[in-house]
Amino acid sequence: MKADQENLPAGYASLLAEIKDRIRSAQYEALRAVNKELVKLYWDIGRMTTERQATGVHGTAVVKRLAADLQAEFPGIVGFSWRNLFYMSEFFTAYRDKPKLQPLVAIIGWTQNLVILQRCKKPLEREFYLRMTARFGWT
């Protein structure tokens, strides 16, 4: 193995380090894109279920059935429990009339959004933690 390293051209180590950094950067950006799309999906599901519930068409039993049907259709995907569907509705309801907060909730992860939503009951407190999480990556 050491003989192989001796035959490498000058600059190989820096090339390898640069490629590794680029791979890690791409992995991080891909994860951020996936998280952003997941939050958008949960927002949309929350919107759809909230709008149906507002018309009196759906209640707890329907949400539980939705959860069971979604879990059956997408068995490898976590996040479609009836409790999480309720969180999605709560998430949408909390921010639907807050256009300046919507870009913030879109860029932080679902778990971070849930923690802020559940622990911060005052709008200004939520806004503070959303901004700090988005800016500094608080977890």
Show which residues each predicted segment covers.
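Basic, low-complexity intrinsically disordered segments
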Residues: 1-139
